[in-house]
Amino acid sequence: MSALSFDPTQVFEALAMQPVDSEGFDAAVVEGGGDTLHCVFLWGKDCYNCNLFKQAALLHQQALRQLDLKWFQADVYQDVALGRRFALHGVPTFVFYRRGKRLGRITGWPGLPQFQAAVAKLQAEA
């Protein structure tokens, strides 16, 4: 599968990623809590590395669903304020929240095993 042979927005549907923006971020992600770990995928249109994640996510969607994350997504090329909020130096970036607290972030797509390990560590610290 080449980097351009798929619709990059398919991953949003596949993982039930809810769109967020700078105006509604706190209400949706931070205050929309519970015990479920929230993962915000910050990306940019035509970002090669973002598309690598999207492609990998489509190939490994079952494994990513098994992580029991509530997914959100935002194009920070379009929503510059949200990118500034997290002082992004690159995308993709994944930011994690639980019960209103920011727990950490991953910059870049490290690959499925490393992503799974990072999520497992955050979930174990609950």
PLM region spans:
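Short active-site neighborhood of thiol/selenol oxidoreductases, capturing the structured segment around
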Residues: 32-46
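The canonical Cys-X-X-Cys-His
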Residues: 47-50, 94
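A short glycine-leucine-enriched loop at secondary-structure breakpoints
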Residues: 85-89
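Thiol-based oxidoreductase modules, predominantly thioredoxin-like and allied folds used
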Residues: 17-22, 42-44, 61, 66-81
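N-terminal leader/targeting and pre-domain segments
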Residues: 1-36, 118-126
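Non-catalytic, surface beta->alpha helical segment in thiol-disulfide oxidoreductase systems
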Residues: 90, 95-126
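Typically the conserved alpha-helix immediately C-terminal to a functionally engaged Cys/Sec
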Residues: 49-65
